[in-house]
Amino acid sequence: MNRAIFTILLAFVATASQAQGNNYTIRGTVDDPDVKVVYLEQQAKGYETLDSAIVTNGEFTMKGKVDKPVPAVVINKYRNVLNLFILEPGDITLKYPFSAVGGTLNDSMTYLATEYPRSIDSTLDDEARSKRFEQYAETMYLRHKDDALGLRILDMCFASPTDKLRLYNMGGLMIKEYPSFVSSKEVWAKYEATSEGKKMLDIQSAFDGKRLSDYVGKGKYVLVDFWASWCPPCREEIPGVVAAHEKYKERGLQVLGLIVNDDKKDADKAIEQMGIPYPQIFGITFEQIASYGINGIPHIILFAPDGTILKRGLRGEGIEKALAKIFGE
């Protein structure tokens, strides 16, 4: 055979093989009968709609090509996320809600999210189990720190903004350019600057001039609850905070509420309804609490007598655990 023709044939076969290797087929289910059309969107750089499909009898199919695996979602017309997965070559089965099977990266993510947690020693407490999970997730992330699996792991598997920032800084280009991370890294950095062991940052009310430093750093342990009357999770935490106040107030604990983006009348009504006995600072804004890397409430911080941050992000039983270590049962 003519050598030139042979070379051309080899190139054609290689190209055809590569094209076939980039193909994907997505088969998915939707529980909501009102969803008639679904949309496939990639999330690697900005948000780009790649395809759409009609839902028939709760099922849909999409086919296409992808150059390299990317984070993706299936959404409805209202942009509600129906499934979150990795778009990669191969056959991918999506089951509502949030189940993806097929493809090396999707299967690895499914193992991490569902199978690995079941393998952790069930006799460990929740904190130890969470730590064990995050250790394994970090190991997997470091093997995939510049691909779609690493991106999903960083996005979903770490609670601490300090850990997120540390791992983000170790990531490759896909991680560094992911829009959600780009917008969040400043918040993570502020959280890191006010993490456990760091000194307090002062906050002043524009309403009456009261300051956080009027209470913190004055020789007492101070438990500070950032909350609002319109926030149901905040109200759920209040009984535990009140109980901590009653139990430890004679043993050196000061409890303080910082009321965020709230109407004064609504806040006063909530204070009366829930029988909150400790002082409050009203007129605090989300812009102010962002200096602590807080992007949602409730957020509860325990300060040492010298103003050092001892614990933050306390919730539920964690409040009593932290205080019992200091004051005893």
Predicted regions and their residues:
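A short beta-strand-turn-helix
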Residues: 203-222
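Conserved redox-active cysteine motifs that mediate thiol-disulfide chemistry
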Residues: 226-243
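Bacterial Sec-dependent N-terminal signal peptides
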Residues: 1-28
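Thiol-based oxidoreductase modules, predominantly thioredoxin-like and allied folds used
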Residues: 251-266, 276-286
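Thiol/disulfide oxidoreductase modules built on the thioredoxin-like
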Residues: 270-276, 283-328
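A non-transmembrane, solvent-exposed segment enriched in polar/low-complexity residues
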Residues: 20-140
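Hydrophobic beta-strand anchors of alpha/beta hydrolase catalytic cores
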Residues: 223-224, 255
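N-terminal targeting signals for export/organelle localization
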Residues: 43, 80, 95-98, 127-197
